[in-house]
Structure formats: structure tokens, C-alpha cells
Design a protein with these regions (language model features):
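Active-site acidic/histidine proton-transfer and metal-coordination neighborhood
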Residues: 17-18, 76-180, 190, 263-268
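Active-site-proximal loop/turn and secondary-structure-junction residues that shape catalytic pockets
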Residues: 10-12, 35-37, 70-73, 113-115, ...
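Structural motif corresponding to the early beta-alpha repeats
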Residues: 29, 33-127, 244-251, 256-258
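Conserved short-loop catalytic and cofactor-binding motifs
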Residues: 7, 41, 83, 155-158, ...
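N-terminal-biased segments
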Residues: 6-17, 46-54
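Catalytic-core regions built around general acid/base machinery
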Residues: 49-59, 132-140, 197, 235-239
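Histidine-acidic metal/acid-base catalytic patches
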Residues: 1-5, 13-27, 58, 89, ...
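Generic enzyme active-site microenvironment
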Residues: 30, 148-149, 182-183, 251
């Protein structure tokens, strides 16, 4: 059975108590997080601080599944610039450690601004990227986590790994057990990708984001009438029922920009959970 998670980028940390109560009532037992949500100083965060956050959620019968926004708060880091690779890997090593202690073992590498290949030809781009992600994969392995590479559409300012197919082919060529494919439904939607092709890459998928373009709210009423999501939902159910997926968690990823109160957050979260179950068949 596919399990449901929701990323806490959707609400303010100050509302954790009420959101946790809601998630329990909805039988949602997982959340994803961004490290900056709880730790303002990634470099110097102590183990006990990380464990405290994990325990707080465990006490409410909720576990961490994954992390995103791995490079949020950094500046000047680009995997294609040799002089910034080592500082970038050092930062990501700490993030992998945080993920490991939280139990958030699926780390989503999106970060379009940190993978700018604009000065490089195709061969140099591939060589540098393969070397960088092999090193990052080894770091992830040492911490018992996986890095999930996310395709980011061109409209987000990305010029490397912009489609699901391209990203899947890169992951396959890299061939590192701790580097997997991140399946992002917002990317599939934005790029108008043929979701029926996803079964070709299903075994590479390490994590899944149920999302809309630009992280718009995952609204039950709206998605119920969206033929693209309905079609993708049917394909998604087939992937899982045929045991083609190697991951068993799908995460709602959205921003709630128009919320003026805690109740607004809670209502949007409830609607997103309903949509995920109705359209994508994610049960709990």
C-alpha cells in the first residue's frame, strides 16, 4: 500500500501542534521537511537538536520520510564550478547527517540555481555532473540515506536535467545505489510529459512528490476535474499495483500562499490529502 506524506513547507512551524493533530485524525503518519525549517545553522546544529525534533513528531505518531530545499540559505554554490564543489559537498554532507538522524532518508536534490551549466558544453557537463553525484552518492551511502535527483522545468530557470526522462537517463548512467530519481508530478504537469512512459523508469524512482506547477495548492475540487491528473492517477495506480515502484511513499508538496490563519492551512491540508487519495490512490 502506498503511504502518504506531506511536506511541511506548506505551513509555519508555529502551527506544528495543530497540523500534527490534523494529520493523525486523517491517518497520515509521515511528513517531509526542509532542514532550514528547524535548524537555522546547518553547519553547527548538534545531534541532540536533531533528535529532539524527530522525537517531538514521533511522540505524535508521525515519522519523517524525506527532505527538500537542501541548499536553501546558501549562496554562490554551483556543482559545475570546481571551486565551489567542495563547500557544496560539505554542506550536503551535513544535510545528509541531519536526514539520517531525523529518519528522513529520501533527500530531494532540486536546486535549479545550484546546477547552472550555462558555460559548459554537453560532454563537460556530463563528466562534471557524474563525478559530483558519484561523490555525493558516497556521502549519502555513509549516512544511510539516498539522494533523489529532481527534474526542474526550464521555466524555473533550469538548464540541467529539465525533464523526467533526461533525469532518469542520467541516474541510470550514473548507476549509484544511493542516487535515485525523484518523480515530481508538478514537473510532469508543467512539461506536459507523457506519464505513460514512466513505467520505463519506475525502478529508478526513490521518492515521489504529488504537486502542481509552481507548488500551487493541491486542491481536491480542482484536481477532480483535471483530466491530466486523472490520467496520471490511473497510471500511478497501475505502477503501484504491478509492483513496479521501489518506493512506497508519496509526498504532497505545495505552498499555501493565501492563508491568513491556521484554519486556512488546515483546510488546505485536508483538501490536499483528500485529492491524493481520490486521484492517486494513496491510502494512508
Amino acid at each position: 500500500m502506498m503511504k502518504l506524506s506531506i511536506s511541511n513547507i506548506a505551513w509555519n512551524v508555529a502551527d506544528d501542534d495543530k497540523v500534527a493533530e490534523l494529520l493523525v485524525s486523517l491517518n497520515v503518519s509521515y511528513i517531509d521537511t526542509a532542514p532550514g525549517k528547524y535548524f537555522s545553522d546547518i553547519k553547527n546544529v548538534k545531534n541532540e537538536e536533531i533528535i529532539k525534533v524527530r522525537q517531538w513528531w514521533q511522540d505524535r505518531n508521525i515519522q519523517f520520510a524525506g527532505m527538500q530545499s537542501l541548499l536553501f540559505g546558501t549562496s554562490g554554490l554551483n556543482l559545475f564550478e570546481i571551486q565551489t564543489q567542495q563547500p557544496m559537498l560539505h554542506h550536503l554532507e551535513k544535510v545528509c547527517h541531519i536526514g539520517s538522524l531525523l529518519g528522513a532518508t529520501r533527500l530531494v536534490f532540486g536546486s535549479p540555481k545550484n546546477r547552472d551549466r550555462s558555460k559548459l558544453d554537453d560532454n563537460s557537463t556530463k563528466d562534471i555532473a557524474l563525478d559530483f553525484f558519484n561523490k555525493l552518492g558516497n556521502i549519502a551511502k555513509s549516512e544511510g540515506v539516498i539522494i533523489c535527483l529532481e527534474a526542474n522545468p526550464v521555466c524555473y530557470g533550469t538548464n540541467f536535467l529539465t525533464t523526467t526522462k533526461e533525469t532518469a537517463e542520467f541516474v541510470k548512467e550514473l548507476n549509484h545505489k544511493n542516487i535515485r530519481l525523484q518523480l515530481d508530478m508538478g514537473t510532469v504537469y508543467t512539461n506536459h510529459e507523457d506519464f505513460s512512459d514512466i513505467d520505463k523508469y519506475a525502478e529508478l524512482i526513490g521518492h515521489i512528490h504529488l504537486s502542481e506547477s509552481n507548488l500551487a495548492k493541491f486542491n481536491s475540487e480542482q484536481l477532480s476535474n483535471d483530466q491530466f491528473h486523472i490520467k496520471c492517477g490511473e497510471e500511478f495506480k497501475n505502477l503501484f499495483s504491478n509492483s513496479l515502484l521501489k518506493t512506497d511513499i508519496a509526498t504532497i508538496e505545495m505552498l499555501i500562499k493565501d492563508a491568513s490563519s491556521t484554519d486556512d492551512y488546515l483546510q488546505s491540508i485536508s483538501s490536499a490529502v483528500e485529492a491524493s487519495r481520490k486521484i492517486y490512490g494513496v491510502e494512508n
